[in-house]
Every structure is written in C-alpha cells, then in structure tokens.
C-alpha cells in the first residue's frame, strides 16, 4: 500500500512516472517553460552554441518582455530584437511583447495550473505556486535543456507545512505573511524544502495574497512554495480563464518535516528594513523614518488588490514623497483603470505606467539615488538592488507604502 503523499510528492511522482520520496534524484517531465528578455537571450545563446535550436513543445513555452520593457538603452533593444527573431523563426505562439507585463503575472493569469511542474529562467518563478504548481527558477543552461528535451532533473525537497488560520487583520495582506515567515525563520532556513501552505478559510486569503507569498518563496531559499489548491484556486482560474481546474491536493496523513501556524487576525503590518529581507520589524518600530520615494508594484505586489488598497488610502490626498505605481500586467492595469484606482493615484501625484520590472531591479523608471530611503512593495532590499549602493530600501505591503507616500515618512496604516 502506498504511503500518504504531500502535494510535492504527488506532483513529482506524476512528473517522474514513479513513486518518489524526499531526497530522491529524479528526472521529471516539464509542463511549462518560460523566460523573459533579460534571461531569454542567454537561453537561446546556449541552444545556438549547442547547435540545438528546437523546442520540445512550442505551446509549452511562454516568453514575456518585462525587465527591459520598454528598452532603456540600445543594448536592451538589441536583446529584444534577437529574441523576437527567435519567436518568429520558431513560431512560438505564447509571446508577450513590451506592452503586456511581467512574466510571472502572465503565468498565473493565463497558464499555471494545480499539479504542474513549471520552470523559468528567473528566481521568482515560485510565484506560480499560488495556484498549487511546483514552480522553480533555473539558470540558462538548465532551461535550454528543458526546452530541448521537455525534462529536467530535480532533488525531491523536504515538505514543510504552514497553516494560515483566521481572517487577516486590517491592512494585513500576503506581503505581511511572507515577511513574517522570513522574520521568524530567516532567509536560509528553508533550503532544500518546499513550503506547502494550507488556508483554513480559503476565501479570506485571495489569490493576489497567495501570489505575493509564493513570489517571495525564493527569498526564503525554498525550492518551491505552494498553496494547497482549494475553492479560491477554482474561483480565480475560472474568473481569469473561463474553466475550472482539476485540483491536486495532499493525502490525509501525509508527513511533513515540521508544521507552523500563523494567526492572521493577530498579525501586525511588517517591514523588512535594510539591507536584508529577513531584517523584519513591526512598522511602528520604524515610524517616522524619512521616505524619498515609494514604489507600489512589481511581480510581488502589482495586482488589483494592491492598487485597491493604495487608492483607498490615497483618495483625495496628495503624496509628499515621489511615488511610482506599476500594475504587473495589462489586465491588472486595465481593471485598475476601469475601477478608478489609476485616476486616484494620478490625482494624488503618483507616476503610473504599465507592467515593467524597471525600478525593482534598479534598471530604469525610478532608480534610487545615493542616500535615499525607498519604501517598496517589491521583493528584495540588498545594497544596490534598486539603484545606488548608498540607498536604503524598506520592503512593505501596499498599505504601508501608500500611507508612507502621503506622509513622507514610514507610517503605520492603522492610524487611518
């Protein structure tokens, strides 16, 4: 009789065609492969050097331009042109040029499904774990190999169980849950593990929040971070794509290396102070810190609920700090526009544009200067991440970011 399996074991058993356990080295079939402009150039280059320009299944490759969108310099334009030639010559159907948005948002909106194995040439591939996919970022050589063969090798991770109980307290979102895990366990604790997150009240913790937590799974050094598929997963995929997915869930009695419970109704707004994602503090510990610029967006927090929160806080007011707001995709931008959130942010003095990674990686569209303090809803705050090595980046959820932009200093949103 087969033992009860975790979600990780179920997915990787199916993908490898055999019964697997943590620690096993396996060859797994891949359901989806993806890359963006910054990494895609290297993936194609690896394939060219090996004289193996072929894709195992063109319908299973997704390409999106986001890091260099729109191209901030001539070299970026050349890179995008190189990838466009590949798309045209190979007849790749799932291609998103500079006018759509961030790769990871494209994946959860349109492609990722429960139980899939997804690889992409970017560390934040873990975002697709929000719908219950085993999603992992890899380097150019591994992605090229997966594109050619449709397979990859993996070490089956140890599964760690997280339970979310209760309803989120006021202004608490997925970012606070991610920061709590980072603060409580530190950034290297989950190396070699998969986090499997169970939500006791599924509709109280929506997909936007789950995507944020999954996105930051890589900051926890986890191999993958997956939410157990439930009625919220069904609701989201049906709303976005028009069909109900088949749910893959763990067996009752499945064994985990450990279990941790978070009481959502007892949480406080959290901030990761410079220069580490696990330097986590309650927001009131940092209250009054001057803020030069606020960034609301990225593949971490660029979804509709993030802009709803920001607009609710900013409505009828004016920002004191520079504020850049970037929805993660065309769809998120359009819906935020239709609901009036974009208008509210523009009226408050924010700069708003469509989906690009620009400021998050210190590439363009709002680079941090020396000595500046930045409050950002993005995923990383190490030195130099958003620009100057002398800038300080504070990571927060949308509520802390929005109220801090209005006040010109780090502020607890619970004052509202």
Curated annotation (Swiss-Prot):
Signal peptide: none annotated. GO terms for biological process: L-leucine biosynthetic process. Binds 1 [4Fe-4S] cluster per subunit. Heterodimer of LeuC and LeuD. [4Fe-4S] cluster binds at residues 299, 357, 360. Coiled coil: none annotated. This is 3-isopropylmalate dehydratase large subunit. PROSITE patterns: ACONITASE_2. Its cofactor is [4Fe-4S] cluster. InterPro entries: Acnase/IPM_dHydase_lsu_aba_1/3, Acoase/IPM_deHydtase_lsu_aba, Aconitase_4Fe-4S_BS, Aconitase_4Fe-4S_dom, HAcnase/IPMdehydase_lsu_prok, Homoacnase/IPMdehydase_lsu, IPM_dehydratase_rel_enz, IPMI_cat. The lineage of its organism: Archaea, Thermoproteota, Thermoprotei, Sulfolobales, Sulfolobaceae. Transmembrane segments: none annotated. The keyword Amino-acid biosynthesis applies. GO terms for molecular function: 3-isopropylmalate dehydratase activity; 4 iron, 4 sulfur cluster binding; metal ion binding. It comes from Saccharolobus solfataricus (strain ATCC 35092 / DSM 1617 / JCM 11322 / P2) (Sulfolobus solfataricus).
């Amino acid at each position: 009789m087969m033992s009860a399996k975790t979600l990780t074991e179920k997915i990787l058993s199916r993908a490898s065609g055999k019964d697997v356990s943590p620690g096993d080295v396996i060859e797994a079939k891949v359901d989806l492969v993806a890359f963006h402009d910054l990494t895609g150039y290297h993936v194609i280059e690896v394939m060219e050097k090996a004289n193996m320009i072929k894709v195992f299944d063109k319908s299973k490759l997704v390409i999106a331009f986001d890091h260099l969108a729109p191209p901030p310099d001539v070299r970026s334009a050349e890179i995008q042109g190189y990838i466009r030639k590949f798309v045209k010559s190979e007849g790749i159907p799932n291609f998103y040029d500079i006018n759509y948005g961030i790769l990871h948002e494209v994946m959860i909106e349109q492609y990722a499904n429960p139980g899939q194995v997804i690889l992409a040439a970017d560390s934040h591939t873990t975002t697709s774990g929000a719908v219950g996919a085993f999603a992992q970022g890899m380097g150019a050589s591994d992605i090229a190999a997966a594109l050619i063969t449709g397979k990859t090798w993996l070490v089956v991770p140890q599964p760690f169980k997280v339970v979310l109980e209760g309803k989120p307290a006021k202004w608490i979102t997925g970012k606070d849950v991610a920061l709590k895990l980072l603060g409580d366990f530190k950034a290297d604790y989950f190396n070699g593990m998969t986090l499997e997150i169970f939500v006791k009240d599924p509709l109280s913790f929506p997909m936007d929040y789950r995507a944020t937590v999954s996105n930051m799974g890589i900051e926890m050094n986890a191999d993958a971070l997956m939410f157990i598929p439930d009625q919220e997963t069904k609701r989201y995929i049906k709303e976005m794509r028009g069909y109900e997915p088949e749910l893959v869930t763990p067996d009752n009695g499945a064994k985990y290396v450990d279990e941790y419970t978070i009481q959502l109704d007892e949480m406080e707004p959290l901030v990761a102070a410079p220069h580490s994602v696990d330097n986590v503090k309650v927001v009131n510990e940092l209250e009054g810190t001057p803020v030069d610029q606020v960034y609301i967006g990225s593949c971490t927090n660029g979804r509709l609920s993030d802009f709803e929160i920001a607009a609710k806080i900013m409505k009828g007011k004016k920002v004191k700090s520079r504020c850049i707001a970037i929805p993660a995709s065309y769809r998120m931008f359009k819906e935020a526009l239709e609901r009036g959130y974009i208008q509210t942010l523009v009226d408050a003095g924010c700069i708003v544009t469509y989906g690009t990674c620009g400021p998050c990686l210190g590439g363009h569209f709002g680079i941090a200067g020396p000595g500046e303090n930045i409050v950002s809803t993005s995923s990383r705050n190490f030195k130099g991440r958003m620009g100057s090595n002398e800038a300080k980046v504070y990571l927060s959820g949308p509520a802390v970011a929005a109220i801090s932009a209005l006040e010109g200093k780090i502020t607890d949103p619970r004052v509202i």
